[in-house]
Amino acid sequence: MTTHPDLAAEQAYIDRAYESLEAARSSANRLKGMVEVGQGGTEQARFEREVIYDTVSFRLNQLHLGDASLLFGRIDREPGDGGDTFYIGRLAVSDANQEPLVVDWRAPVAEPFYRATGRDPMGLARRRHFQTRGRQLLGIEDELFGEHALDLGEGAGLQGHGSLIAALETARSGRLGDIVATIQGEQDEIIRSPLPGILVVQGGPGTGKTVVALHRAAYLLYTHRFPLEDQGVLVVGPNRLFLAYIEQVLPSLGEAGVELAVLADLIDTVSVRGTDREEVARLKGDEVMRKVLAKAVRDRKRPLPRTLRLPHGLQNLVLDVHESAEIVRDARRRFRTHNAGRRFVEREVARVLAESSRTPIDPTELWRQVRRHPMVVEALERMWPVLTPAQLLHDLFGSRALLRLAGRKVVSEEHLDLLHRPRSASVDDVVWTQDDIPLLDEAYALLGPRRRKRDDDEVRTYGHIVVDEAQDLSPMQLRMLARRSLNGSMTVVGDIAQSTGAWAHDSWDEVLAHLPDRRPGRREELTVGYRIPGPNMDLAARVLSRSAPDLAAPRAVRQDGRPPRLHRVDPAAGSEGIGRAVVESVRAELAGVGQGNVAIICPRSRLEDISSDLRAAGIEHGVAIEQGLEHQVTVVPVGMVKGLELDATVVVDPTGIIEEEAQGLRALYVALTRATKHLTLVHHGELPEALQPPADDRRSGSDHQVGSPEAVRAAG
């Protein structure tokens, strides 16, 4: 951006806004200090102080910008629309007279900043974008509308083209940043979409679907502060690496109260320590498990096999088989959840035993005397045991007999055997997997809380739920999320073309079938790829044409850039040749990205070898499985890289990725679409067929033309 004649005046306005922001922060800190000093008083006074303290703390959190810029632009309305000027920023700021200096980007008046186009200027005469670093104004970009409109050239259809490109070319930090200054029209439509119902956002790589969903959460909290602040907003991600990657976005937008979680976090009674084979994960995720678990719970409600004769004084109190069956039948009919019926069963057992006495006896007093008797304990354990979800699954999966009893009518015996695992000595010793989590949740829905157990809380529900990478979730995982929706309001985000794992879906209809249907689902699609350079997307599109031929690749904003590099390794060189090629490629990419980051994306089977090769070469790096991308160089298994963005990527062994992953071509497509700048492929021998150029191009020898992959000398 060249020097703009209004640069000094706009810098002065920005300085004034920051001064007012500092004044507001100082005022809030003084008020907080006064509240902290206050002690004693009535209960009402203490309550009021707590409310004030929470309110002030929330406001202080909003006023903390860190390194983020306060302002990023302004809009000037046409004289016929008032001729007003509004400065758009991260949060609302007023001067000492309460005159607005900055309008919150989520306010309705700010909408034209993101949505106005030449065809629909929305009453604007001019839109001005600021390029800033902190509080310093570096440049100004103007867009004129109406009779003053200019030809925008290559940026047509994009708001703030220069600012957008500058933001896209900024080096990655290992954390996802907000896009509040460069939100585009199609993104803003999704962000401001109404709260009720389910909104499905389909978006290819680099379209910004994740960050759009997070900005939508911030927008909904601003627009519907009451009731969402009390009801809560939940963001669910595919893994902890992904959560670490996105965790700073909402706080940077002044919304620190949103809960970020993986599915396992929603069940806090167990820890995930194992992984299921694909065929086991497929079965555990199938909706048929609803019937298996419901039958497993029903199977634990059984009449006595023989009459109970309980010694009591000089007589035996009797509960016969028929009476026990009546009690179980009545309890099944009366109670929706299993554990809720236990008290009724106890009372009925006490009543029948008391009625069998030759002398009158109070059932309540009798129960107090006999409830711990081993024969009574055994009878109740048979008729109606108190169960936790973990106990139910521990017993079920540890017994082939119980599995067949619960599932024989809906699951084949061969598949039931997949669920069996050796019984642990204790439920605390069970190695739970990610795919057990929705089954534990389903079991809790069937069992309910245990009486007088405070740790058995009711399922927490939320006023809005954002689900990222939803295309990979199983029916049982989706049921788990639906159970946490208070009112059916959800934002479901993903890309069918990137659907991988045991439950990869081929359409959003398959996903929506398991989510709340109080209102018809709305669908939006992001079609523009902002992050991935055109040459990288062109290579990835070859894979897409085979893995999901009905889907189109996003249209890349940046058509320039270095073509992907293909680093061929002689098959005779083996793993050592791969290691040398990876080290050479990483060094080349580090030289090209400066302070940016580099990720080596590989099959999980190569993770340790590649890390050892980098260590031997003296390249400091991290291995991202659970932790984030703090290192400049990181080795990431292909199954964990979805949703991340890096400056440069080295994709190792594309053939191995295709062969090892459940949806190999889709996994390779994910791997090829992570780089915002440079992409290198390290491969043994010939490239997989999916990466070969079309036959016509191969015959014409066009594979090495500009915009096509660059071949690197063979290694080995």
Question: Where in the sequence are the language-model features?
Answer:
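Short glycine/proline-rich turn/loop motifs
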Residues: 163-170, 424-425, 520-522
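P-loop NTPase Walker
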Residues: 2-24, 65-68, 133, 150-152, ...
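Amphipathic, well-packed alpha-helical segments that form the structural scaffold of globular domains
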Residues: 184, 188, 192-195, 218, ...
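Phosphate/oxyanion-binding active-site loops and adjacent basic polyanion-contact surfaces
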Residues: 175, 179, 209-213, 289, ...
